[in-house]
């Protein structure tokens, strides 16, 4: 099973950016924990981070025929990007949206997700564990 992991804008700043909101783990730390779990599950991961909406759309579109699912933290694009939402919908790949913080308990503008309605589900508020829970959800979904 192959899963594409996508990290959106500013996630490359984790560990130093608002640690009271996002925690002290770096993106490399999160990727390492994902790789450990993937190894246990027998899942192959491809991990990509970009601050560019177009680059993320390109990666999503290129996933068709190469991946069995997408694990995505769209970050700020969660609330603004119809392009990312449409790209995910067009792939028809099982997709889980994850967030480090609980987007529903934050500022009003952060509570709306363009991705959630077309995703298998959304996991938020569990810090780095949101990613691990999302990977397990995709794995279990694809095993059926």
Swiss-Prot record:
Its EC number is 4.2.1.10. Gene3D superfamilies: Dehydroquinase, class II (3.40.50.9100). The record marks 17 as: Transition state stabilizer. It comes from Geotalea uraniireducens (strain Rf4) (Geobacter uraniireducens). This is 3-dehydroquinate dehydratase. The gene is aroQ. The keyword Amino-acid biosynthesis applies. Keywords: Amino-acid biosynthesis, Aromatic amino acid biosynthesis, Lyase. The active site is at 22 (proton acceptor), 99 (proton donor). Homododecamer. It catalyses: 3-dehydroquinate = 3-dehydroshikimate + H2O. One of its GO terms (molecular function) is 3-dehydroquinate dehydratase activity. Catalyzes a trans-dehydration via an enolate intermediate. Pathway: Metabolic intermediate biosynthesis; chorismate biosynthesis; chorismate from D-erythrose 4-phosphate and phosphoenolpyruvate: step 3/7. One of its GO terms (biological process) is aromatic amino acid family biosynthetic process. Belongs to the type-II 3-dehydroquinase family. Substrate binds at residues 73, 79, 86, 100-101, 110.
């Amino acid at each position: 099973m192959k899963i594409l992991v996508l990290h959106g804008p500013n996630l490359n700043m984790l560990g130093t950016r608002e640690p009271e909101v996002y925690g002290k783990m770096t993106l490399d730390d999160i990727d390492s924990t994902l790789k450990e779990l993937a190894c246990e599950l027998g899942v192959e991961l491809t991990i990509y981070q970009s601050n560019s909406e177009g680059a993320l759309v390109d990666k999503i579109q290129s996933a068709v025929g190469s991946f069995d699912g997408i694990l995505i933290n769209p970050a700020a694009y969660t609330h603004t990007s119809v392009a990312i939402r449409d790209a995910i919908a067009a792939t028809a790949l099982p997709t889980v949206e994850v967030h480090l913080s609980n987007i529903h308990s934050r500022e009003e503008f952060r509570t709306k997700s363009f991705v959630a309605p077309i995703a298998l589900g959304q996991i938020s508020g569990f810090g780095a564990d949101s990613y691990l829970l999302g990977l397990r959800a995709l794995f279990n979904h694809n095993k059926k």
